[in-house]
C-alpha cells in the first residue's frame, strides 16, 4: 500500500513510497484540497512544519512537512483535469492554492552539506567550476533555461579556468519541455519562447572567452539536449548512457540549439545528415566513432564525474593559455565565415513554420507524446522490413 499517512509515516518511509511509484503511476494524495498523483521526491533537512502541511515552494516544487522532517515533491498530475491530465511542475498544477506558501530561495552555490532540493547547483574544485542542472526527465522549460543561463553567466564570472556542465545523474538534457508547452494556452508561442531560451543558453556557452568548457554527460541526452552538449569545448560521456541526436520524430521538428553549426563541425556534413535523418538511438561507442563525444568512461555517475573533474583540472593546468587562445581564434574564424546569428536565424525560420505554419504535425506529435497516445503503426524509419517487402514485391518474379 503506497498511501502516505502524513501524521504517522517518517520521512524515510514517505520517500520510499514516493520513489517506488515514480514514473508510473505516482502516489495518489490530497494536496491543498486537490486529488493528485505525486512524483520526484527529495529529503529536506532544515525546514519544519506541522505534518502534512505545504511549508515552502521553490522553482516549481513544493515542500511538505512529515512527522519528523520534510520532503520536496517536484511534479504532480491531476488525472481529472480535462485539459492537462499529465505530469507538470507542482506549482503549475496547484496554481493559486500556493498563494500563502512562502518561497524559499536558495543560492546556487549554497553548501551542499544539508539535504534539500534544487535543480541548479554550483560548486568549485580549485580552478574548476561545476554547474549541475538536474531537471526532471531532462526536460527544460523556458523558466528553467532562463535560470540556467543566469547561473552559467554567474559561473563564468568566477576566477576559475574550466566550467563543467554536469547536467543530472539520470538525464543530461532532453531539450524543450513538451509537457509545459502542451499545458500552455498558447502552445505555439510557448514553444517559441522555450526554443529561444535554450538557444540563449547555448549562445552563452559558445561565446565564452574566459573559460574552457566541458559537457559531462552523466545521464542520457536526447533531441536538443545532445546539441546543447556539443556547444562545449570538450564532450565527455559516461559509458552506459544513450544519445538520441535527432528531432524529426517529433512531427518533423527541424530543431535549433545551433545544431546546423555544431553537428557538421564534429561529424561532417554527410555524418550530420546521416545522424539526423537516421533518427536512431546511439551508444557512446558509436558517438565516439562519429565524433560527437571526445571520451567515454565510468560505470556510475559519481565515478564518472570524479574523473571528469580530474580531467578538467588538467585542462586548467596544462597549456591553458594556449588552449584558450586557440579557442578564441577558432571562434573568430568561424564567425567570420558565417556568424552564429545567421545559423540561429535560419534554424528559427524553420522552427517558426513548425510552430505557426499550416502543417500541424509537430503539435499533433507533441499532443500524442505527452498524453501517451500510441502510434497507429511503427514508424517507417524503424520498420525497415516494410521497405524490403515493398522492394521484393516490385522485383520481377522468377519462373519456377
Predicted regions and their residues:
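A structural preference for short, pocket-lining loop segments at secondary-structure junctions
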Residues: 126-131, 145-187, 200-214, 238-242, ...
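Crotonase-fold acyl-CoA enzyme core
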Residues: 207-210, 216-223, 231-242, 246-322
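Conserved CoA-thioester-binding segment of acyl-CoA-metabolizing enzymes
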Residues: 85-166
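An anion-binding loop in the catalytic cleft
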Residues: 2-115
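C-terminal long alpha-helix characteristic of the crotonase
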Residues: 293-362
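C-terminal extensions of enzymes
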Residues: 337-400
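Phosphate/pyrophosphate-binding betaalpha-module
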Residues: 193-196, 200-204, 215, 226-227, ...
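Short, active-site-adjacent cap segments at secondary-structure transitions
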Residues: 170-173, 222, 375
Amino acid at each position: 500500500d503506497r498511501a502516505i499517512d502524513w501524521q504517522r509515516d517518517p520521512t524515510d518511509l514517505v520517500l520510499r513510497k514516493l520513489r517506488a511509484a515514480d514514473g508510473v503511476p505516482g502516489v495518489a494524495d490530497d494536496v491543498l484540497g486537490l486529488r493528485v498523483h505525486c512524483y520526484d521526491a527529495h529529503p529536506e533537512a532544515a525546514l519544519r512544519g506541522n505534518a502534512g502541511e505545504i511549508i515552502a515552494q521553490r522553482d516549481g516544487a513544493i515542500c511538505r512537512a512529515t512527522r519528523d522532517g520534510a520532503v520536496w515533491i517536484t511534479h504532480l498530475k491531476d488525472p481529472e483535469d480535462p485539459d492537462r491530465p499529465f505530469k507538470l511542475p507542482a506549482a503549475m498544477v496547484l496554481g493559486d492554492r500556493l498563494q500563502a506558501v512562502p518561497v524559499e530561495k536558495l543560492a546556487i552555490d549554497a553548501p551542499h552539506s544539508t539535504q534539500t532540493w534544487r535543480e541548479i547547483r554550483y560548486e568549485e574544485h580549485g580552478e574548476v567550476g561545476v554547474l549541475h542542472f538536474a531537471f526532471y526527465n531532462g526536460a527544460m522549460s523556458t523558466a528553467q533555461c532562463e535560470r540556467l543561463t543566469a547561473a552559467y553567466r554567474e559561473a563564468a564570472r568566477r576566477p576559475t579556468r574550466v566550467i563543467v556542465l554536469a547536467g543530472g545523474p539520470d538525464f543530461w538534457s532532453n531539450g524543450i519541455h513538451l509537457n509545459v508547452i502542451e499545458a500552455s494556452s498558447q502552445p505555439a508561442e510557448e514553444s517559441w519562447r522555450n526554443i529561444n531560451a535554450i538557444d540563449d543558453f547555448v549562445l552563452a556557452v559558445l561565446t565564452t572567452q574566459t573559460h574552457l568548457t566541458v559537457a559531462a554527460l552523466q545521464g542520457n541526452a536526447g533531441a536538443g539536449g545532445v546539441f546543447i552538449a556539443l556547444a562545449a569545448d570538450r564532450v565527455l560521456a559516461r559509458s552506459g548512457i544513450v544519445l538520441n541526436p535527432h528531432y524529426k520524430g517529433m512531427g518533423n521538428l527541424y530543431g535549433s540549439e545551433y545544431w546546423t553549426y555544431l553537428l557538421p563541425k564534429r561529424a561532417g556534413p554527410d555524418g550530420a545528415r546521416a545522424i539526423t535523418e537516421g533518427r536512431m538511438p546511439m551508444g557512446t561507442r558509436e558517438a565516439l566513432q562519429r565524433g560527437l563525444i571526445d571520451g567515454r568512461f565510468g560505470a556510475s555517475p559519481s565515478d564518472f564525474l570524479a574523473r571528469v573533474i580530474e580531467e578538467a583540472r588538467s585542462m586548467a593546468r596544462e597549456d591553458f593559455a594556449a588552449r584558450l587562445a586557440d579557442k578564441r581564434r577558432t571562434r573568430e574564424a568561424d564567425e567570420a565565415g558565417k556568424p552564429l546569428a545567421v545559423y540561429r536565424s535560419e534554424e528559427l525560420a524553420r522552427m517558426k513554420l513548425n510552430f505557426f505554419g499550416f502543417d500541424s504535425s509537430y503539435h499533433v506529435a507533441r499532443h500524442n507524446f505527452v498524453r501517451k497516445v500510441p502510434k497507429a503503426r511503427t514508424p517507417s524509419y524503424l520498420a525497415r522490413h516494410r521497405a524490403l517487402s515493398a522492394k521484393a514485391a516490385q522485383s520481377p518474379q522468377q519462373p519456377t
